[in-house]
Amino acid sequence: VEPAETLELQCALAWPPVTGRWLGTWWFRAAGGFTGRANTALAIGDPGVPVTEALERVCEFAHSHGLEPAVQAVQHGPVERALAARGWVPNVAHEAGHEVSVLVGPLGGPAETARILGEPTPGWWELCAGTTEPSEAQRHVLTTAPALGYGVVEAGTETVGAVRAAVVDDVLHVSRLAVAPAYRRKGLAADLMAAAGAWAGARGATRCALQVSVANAPALALYHRLGFTEHHRYRYWVPATPACEDRSP
């Protein structure tokens, strides 16, 4: 089984922050608060300094970007144990869910009606980001990974399904899968996944990965039907006050 941290890094590279800084193999990320993944420190491997010092650097970076300090760590891994020993706690208040399942599965394909575009359309933005006028942070995170495709299903002039696809190494990273309410339960989500899989296979991908909150039962059920299984989980951790004071000027 591939180490969880390798897959974590591949998923993170598919979701680039506006600003990033490396400390050893830890990656500090900031993107104006748009998504937990792009605004936390991905703590994998060795930061190259003692963990206590690394966490101080996490705090300094977050505060300098107007963020609350937070770490993304593989569940039950050595980093979590180090965090707990230093007074950090799982961020149970995280709006989208602090515990996330990383699923892996087959590419699938071909699609029936879904297609992959080279540029996002207004309809894609509306479904995937909830707006046709994305913020600078939304646009950066969602459109600057190296190999990107924007999946859509259209009914006339209306975009009724959308998904984001990114290829990193041999992994297709799928995100922002959305279907308009009136068009759900018609197989569009599966068709979007198939289109993404066929597109990614032509670009060297051999498998698919995605990240889903463990609280999102409908999404987990869909992906399990499509042959996905859980590879590992990660959690968001935050310092218990006053372990991480804001020292920024």
Enumerate the predicted regions with their spans.
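Conserved acetyl-CoA-binding loop-helix of GNAT-fold acetyltransferases
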Residues: 51-59, 176-181, 185-202, 221-225
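A conserved beta-strand-loop-helix scaffold within acyl/acetyltransferase catalytic domains
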Residues: 139-180
